[in-house]
Amino acid sequence: MQYWGKIIGVAVALMMGGGFWGVVLGLLVGHMFDKARSRKMAWFANQRERQALFFATTFEVMGHLTKSKGRVTEADIHIASQLMDRMNLHGDSRTAAQNAFRVGKADNYPLREKMRQFRSVCFGRFDLIRMFLEIQIQAAFADGSLHPNEREVLYVIAEELGISRVQFDQFLRMMQGGAQFGGGYHQQSGGGWQQAQRGPTLEDACNVLGVKTTDDATTIKRAYRKLMSEHHPDKLVAKGLPPEMMEMAKQKAQEIQKAYELIKEQKGFK
């Protein structure tokens, strides 16, 4: 009820013997209270809507990416299940993710339309958009190879989300470097991806932070702080990341932290 503030304001004014002007003041104060409460309720509703859309779109696009290679195999489904495990999805959340994955596999899935809708509810929150794209990149090469069709789908996603080819290619390099810190995959010379077999290098660490090995300490620290802020799990959830995906944000933040520690050690700064 959006008029309780007015009722309480008038009641308090009458109890205090405020007279006509006291009642008017009580109405005004109560109206302001009701308006603020209404805005707060609308914010929570929009937040839930944004999180629900992020969740559904994430798994729909995963399904679309998988189908872009051709027939969806048991191995593809197993990989999707592993990603759900990484997000600690169980019960209703897992069922919702599986249903969304199936929706995305449809031949007529409207990818561009879905991406425009997703971008509109993000309200320019680049960290949310970035997290979404990073999840899709992980899903695309989780089977050990980045199929040309998957790459084309990723290019469409990036384009509709306002990310240039240059930015996208940088994201790929950052994911490549991050694989050495998170037990994932690294890029082969042929353009595919394979499971990491070596330890992380200074170049890997710099790729994670999006810096060069020749950059100075100030530049590296600035990049590190920016990335940690953009991947802060609580901040991302507050902006619309579904709570179920907080674990992936934590894992990404850990990769960034490990990369930064390696850079500090090898370049000799604190």
Swiss-Prot record:
<feature type="topological domain" description="Cytoplasmic">
    <location>
        <begin position="32"/>
        <end position="270"/>
    </location>
</feature>
<keyword id="KW-0143">Chaperone</keyword>
<feature type="topological domain" description="Periplasmic">
    <location>
        <begin position="1"/>
        <end position="6"/>
    </location>
</feature>
<keyword id="KW-0472">Membrane</keyword>
<dbReference type="InterPro" id="IPR050817">
    <property type="entry name" value="DjlA_DnaK_co-chaperone"/>
</dbReference>
<protein>
    <recommendedName>
        <fullName>Co-chaperone protein DjlA</fullName>
    </recommendedName>
</protein>
<dbReference type="GO" id="GO:0051087">
    <property type="term" value="F:protein-folding chaperone binding"/>
</dbReference>
<dbReference type="InterPro" id="IPR001623">
    <property type="entry name" value="DnaJ_domain"/>
</dbReference>
<keyword id="KW-1133">Transmembrane helix</keyword>
<dbReference type="Pfam" id="PF00226">
    <property type="entry name" value="DnaJ"/>
</dbReference>
<dbReference type="Pfam" id="PF05099">
    <property type="entry name" value="TerB"/>
</dbReference>
<feature type="domain" description="J">
    <location>
        <begin position="204"/>
        <end position="270"/>
    </location>
</feature>
<dbReference type="InterPro" id="IPR023749">
    <property type="entry name" value="DjlA"/>
</dbReference>
<keyword id="KW-0812">Transmembrane</keyword>
<dbReference type="InterPro" id="IPR007791">
    <property type="entry name" value="DjlA_N"/>
</dbReference>
<dbReference type="InterPro" id="IPR029024">
    <property type="entry name" value="TerB-like"/>
</dbReference>
<comment type="subunit">
    <text>Homodimer.</text>
</comment>
<keyword id="KW-1003">Cell membrane</keyword>
<keyword id="KW-0997">Cell inner membrane</keyword>
<comment type="function">
    <text>Regulatory DnaK co-chaperone. Direct interaction between DnaK and DjlA is needed for the induction of the wcaABCDE operon, involved in the synthesis of a colanic acid polysaccharide capsule, possibly through activation of the RcsB/RcsC phosphotransfer signaling pathway. The colanic acid capsule may help the bacterium survive conditions outside the host.</text>
</comment>
<dbReference type="GO" id="GO:0005886">
    <property type="term" value="C:plasma membrane"/>
</dbReference>
<dbReference type="InterPro" id="IPR036869">
    <property type="entry name" value="J_dom_sf"/>
</dbReference>
<feature type="transmembrane region" description="Helical">
    <location>
        <begin position="7"/>
        <end position="31"/>
    </location>
</feature>
